[in-house]
């Protein structure tokens, strides 16, 4: 058995930072899509956050590794301004709401299946009180997508103490369909999500890729 290698705290920090791409040399010229793809291939996930102080959260990891870069190039790769069916990243739940390479979508289908097994309490309430709503929202997206939550025509409820998001039932239905993979984000305008059928957003070769088994 080989001897155990010991690292100091400083060495361990440097290893961790290098693994995340911080040791790579920055481009000397204009940053383009090739450089951004290199970062995305390395880190695989860009967390999305609605909080906007300095800049939107998903722009910052790329900036930290490349320095100034054209944000519209990242937008194009993420699908926010990509041609339908050609985004290189898509939105879904990883450790949090994130942008993820489209090629990893099959690896997240286990989580999409879980939406049927473990529905949210709000969805159980809707299924009991308004069972037609989910089908109505599905049809609305099919006929008119991409749509915003506001396009469901359901008003936002009065603010409730302790409830951060205060979603109306139309938004809950869309987010549930998003969780189960039936819809995805087609674009964002002023950071507002537009939902459309996943089959109209993601590349067909991704959608037709086999689903790994639970053991895999």
Regions found by a protein language model. Name each.
Residues 1-216:
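Long, low-complexity intrinsically disordered regions
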């Amino acid at each position: 058995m080989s001897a155990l290698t010991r690292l100091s705290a400083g060495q361990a920090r440097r290893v961790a930072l290098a693994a995340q791409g911080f040791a790579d040399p920055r481009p000397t010229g204009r940053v383009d899509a090739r450089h951004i793809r290199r970062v995305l291939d390395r880190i695989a996930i860009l967390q999305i956050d609605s909080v906007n102080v300095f800049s939107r959260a998903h722009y910052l990891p790329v900036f930290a590794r490349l320095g100034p870069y054209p944000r519209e190039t990242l937008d194009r790769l993420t699908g926010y301004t990509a041609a339908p069916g050609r985004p290189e990243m898509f939105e879904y739940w990883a450790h949090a709401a994130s942008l993820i390479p489209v090629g990893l979508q099959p690896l997240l289908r286990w989580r999409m299946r879980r939406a049927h097994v473990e529905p949210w309490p709000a969805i159980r309430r809707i299924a009991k009180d308004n069972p037609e709503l989910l089908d109505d929202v599905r049809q609305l997206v099919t006929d008119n997508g991409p749509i915003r939550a506001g396009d469901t025509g359901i008003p936002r409820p009065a603010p409730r103490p302790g409830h951060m998001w205060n979603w109306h039932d139309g938004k809950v239905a869309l987010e549930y369909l998003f969780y189960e993979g039936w819809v995805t984000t087609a674009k964002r305008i002023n950071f507002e999500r537009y939902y459309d059928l996943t089959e109209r957003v993601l590349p067909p070769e991704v959608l037709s890729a086999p689903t790994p088994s639970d053991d895999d």
